[in-house]
Amino acid sequence: MERAMEQLNRLTRSLRRARTVELPEDNETAVYTLMPMVMADQHRSVSELLSNSKFDVNYAFGRVKRSLLHIAANCGSVECLVLLLKKGANPNYQDISGCTPLHLAARNGQKKCMSKLLEYSADVNICNNEGLTAIHWLAVNGRTELLHDLVQHVTDVDVEDAMGQTALHVACQNGHKTTVQCLLDSGADINRPNVAGATPLYFACSHGQRDTAQILLLRGAKYLPDKNGVTPLDLCVQGGYGQTCEVLIQYHPRLFQTIVQMTQNEDLRENMLRQVLQHLSQQSESQYLKILTGLAEVATTNGHKLLSLSSSYEAQMKSLLRIVRIFCHVFRIGPSSPSNGMDMGYNGNKTPRSQVFKPLELLWHSLDEWLVLIATELMKNKEDSADITSILLKQKGQDQEASCISAFEPPGPGSYERLSTGPGESKPDVLAGKQEASADCQDVISVTANRLSAVIQAFYMCCSCQMPPGMTSPRFIEFVCKHDEVLKCFVNRNPKIIFDHFHFLLECPELMSRFMHIIKAQPFKDRCEWFYEHLHSGQPDSDMVHRPVSENDILLVHRDSIFRSSCEIVSKANCAKLKQGIAVRFHGEEGMGQGVVREWFDILSNEIVNPDYALFTQSADGTTFQPNSNSYVNPDHLNYFRFAGQILGLALNHRQLVNIYFTRSFYKHILGIPVNYQDVASIDPEYAKNLQWILDNDISDLGLELTFSVETDVFGAMEEVPLKPGGGSILVTQNNKAEYVQLVTELRMTRAIQPQINAFLQGFHMFIPPSLIQLFDEYELELLLSGMPEIDVNDWIKNTEYTSGYEREDPVIQWFWEVVEDMTQEERVLLLQFVTGSSRVPHGGFANIMGGSGLQNFTIAAVPYTPNLLPTSSTCINMLKLPEYPSKEILKDRLLVALHCGSYGYTMA
């Protein structure tokens, strides 16, 4: 009966308290019953359960083998913690990581738990498996209020962890000022090194902790490197911690010059150096001038080393340009509170800002001397070549042919062997001396061109940073004009110099024109790399299509109204962010990523030429599109043209191909290349043939009575539109017919769609600068935007006709097709463009190629062979005029020269 009553009482208590009132006998089961109560600090319940139990309060459980005392200390359950201690819990028991309850209380800032643990003899000097004591944990988290209590129980405030780090090390690293002061007040060793030789100051600088570094220096901390020679300043600069560098310089002024010299260290990231020097320069005008003067001196020293042929070109070139870039960056930033461009310089004199460039004048003077010397030698060699030519002519008795020989052309092979002996025996020695001098000059150019070009690049950067944005320095323009011949000699000898050092051409249209013919002669691939290198310069993200961090940067478009919704969103988007990356999501769909971006561009490229928007019309060949002169029927047509330009610019910026091809004339408009009468064929082939007829025939006695005006339909009424002022009264004659053809071409191809072109270019240039896109011609621009189409050579052969004496079985024709089969896909496209004016095969293959009067098969016509003759073409009739070359090798060489050099209208090379 008594036992039954006891069970009933236990049942009642359990139901009232909604828990068990007895612990299981098994420790593993019991501990998981107690743990939630300990975490909630339900000390009465824990006490009741423990009172009638044999539970081991030091029982370790779980993966990390902690006791309930660890749990209480970790959670701040002070009442349960005291209860467990009274029940005999061990305050110094270590879990699997070596942590005691005191470690956990210190880490989490449980002050009351720490106090009780210390009362029950918790050992503050116990280290965990990493060598950390409780004092380390307090230092890591900046628990200064607890540290005061704990240090009274610590026997050694400089106790080290496994890496030899004291609490002061970690407090300095984490920037806890009051903790650092407390440790120092408690006797911590301010210069104590860890196993790597790193002091607390080293640790403070490694994380840019300005305030803790200042406390240490104020209290006499020594400036010491670690065992590898890395100094606190090195760490500050590596991290870009300008404020901490400033503190170091305040206590150790000699470090200022060290920072300037660090610009030569290629292992240091340039952007970190910029951050440091930018911060220092903004503190005062005097410091700003001091930094710039120091950088100018270092740049001058490095520049002269670069001009020394015994130095390493690659290393010195990179060093010079790096220093100059930093110099220009700091110069543009300037101090926060400039003193009207003047302040006391570090030498005690009033120093205008322009004076910081003075040390560099020595380098520019050396550069000028080098270029003048080379120019002199080049001129001397030209004179020597003229002397050699004169000698040869006299020896051969051919003075009457002198007018046929170039004054600057050196003698050809075998010239010296044909010289007579006897009285003129010494002549070859004279000529040999002159040839050796010429060879020496060329050798000098070979070894100096890259070095001098790198210094020229540095000179341009320094000139530019003194000019307003968008303006070219008159001094630099004068410099290039003065040394024009030598610079062209450099790039002719080594065209790669353009891409390596002549970046100024992209920013100076007035100079670009001088070198454009050389640039255009460079391989398409090299120009593409140069294009994208400068297009993306300054952009932080190398992965061009990525998911932006912010949801606001995602272009959310509606699939059922993709053109209009995309137009609205792109017009409002931040252009700078769009240049860095694009993320697109279709409304109601989860998909994102590069595949969605590609789909977006593909759909939009089709929508741009959708007839519903009336923006573009199909050309005569049915494969390309031209701006619609009647697009005004759509009230928003100019906004849409601007959007079309943005889409093509974005696609080019992000290397995304568009599924659309335009007429050759429209690509010319994008490039700023004037159109010609042949471009008219894309919209009116018959009219183009008429213009061709006028040019090909004498119109003097035909009585055409044409004037410099045309009749055009303006809203249903015929009006006379002058091609130039007073054109209605100016007759077209044999002498001015070329001007007439050009003006009427411009009317049809440009003036009629000028507003549309302007709107398109406004959008396109938001992402693609005009100076960059001019690196290409209209054929190359098409490849950049739309990619390279596949060409079926068998279909090409099947649908080719032969004329003027050629037949399919002729050796020249067989050689031709063998060469075509061996061509790369790019070269085949160039051949197709060369002959037809288009890089695409129309739907249905070569059988559907259009000419000026309708369907016109690809045709190969025979031309009599003369040495060096190049193939030519007539694009209006898709005809390749192929000379009857004597061998396959010559045919291949001449054909590739024509394709890569663009022999449109030229027949010799």
Curated annotation (Swiss-Prot):
InterPro entries for the chain: Ankyrin_rpt (IPR002110), Ankyrin_rpt-contain_sf (IPR036770), E3_ubiq-protein_ligase (IPR050409), HECT_dom (IPR000569), Hect_E3_ubiquitin_ligase (IPR035983)
Active-site feature positions: 876 (glycyl thioester intermediate)
PTM characteristics: Autoubiquitinated.
All copies of domain HECT, residue ranges: 574-909
Regulation: Sterically autoinhibited in its dimeric state.
GO molecular function: small GTPase binding; ubiquitin protein ligase activity; ubiquitin-protein transferase activity
Keywords: ANK repeat, Cell cycle, Cytoplasm, Endoplasmic reticulum, Golgi apparatus, Membrane, Repeat, Transcription, Transcription regulation, Transferase, Ubl conjugation, Ubl conjugation pathway
Protein's cellular compartments: Golgi apparatus, Golgi stack membrane; Cytoplasm; Endoplasmic reticulum
Pathway: Protein modification; protein ubiquitination
Annotated stretches, region: N-terminal helix important for homodimerization: 1-21
Ranges where the record places region Disordered: 409-428
Entry GO terms, CC: cytoplasm; endoplasmic reticulum; Golgi cisterna membrane; Golgi membrane; nuclear body; nucleus
Annotated catalysed reactions: S-ubiquitinyl-[E2 ubiquitin-conjugating enzyme]-L-cysteine + [acceptor protein]-L-lysine = [E2 ubiquitin-conjugating enzyme]-L-cysteine + N(6)-ubiquitinyl-[acceptor protein]-L-lysine
Pfam families attached to this UniProt entry: Ank_2, Ank_5, HECT
GO terms of biological process kind: Golgi organization; membrane fusion; protein K48-linked ubiquitination; protein ubiquitination; regulation of cell migration; ubiquitin-dependent protein catabolic process
Top-level taxonomic group: Eukaryota
EC number: 2.3.2.26
The ANK repeat ranges on this chain: 23-55, 64-93, 97-126, 130-159, 163-192, 196-226, 228-253
Quaternary organization: Homodimer. The homodimer is autoinhibited and stabilized by its N-terminal helix. Interacts with RAB1 (RAB1A, RAB1B or RAB1C), RAB4 (RAB4A or RAB4B) and RAB11 (RAB11A or RAB11B); in a GTP-dependent manner. Interacts with the 26S proteasomal complex through the 20S core proteasomal subunit. Interacts with RARB.
Protein function: E3 ubiquitin-protein ligase involved in Golgi membrane fusion and regulation of small GTPases. Acts as a regulator of Golgi membrane dynamics during the cell cycle: recruited to Golgi membrane by Rab proteins and regulates postmitotic Golgi membrane fusion. Acts by mediating ubiquitination during mitotic Golgi disassembly, ubiquitination serving as a signal for Golgi reassembly later, after cell division. Specifically binds GTP-bound RAC1, mediating ubiquitination and subsequent degradation of active RAC1, thereby playing a role in host defense against pathogens.
Domain notes: The N-terminal lobe of the HECT domain is important for interaction with E2 ubiquitin-conjugating enzymes.
Identification of the protein by name: E3 ubiquitin-protein ligase HACE1
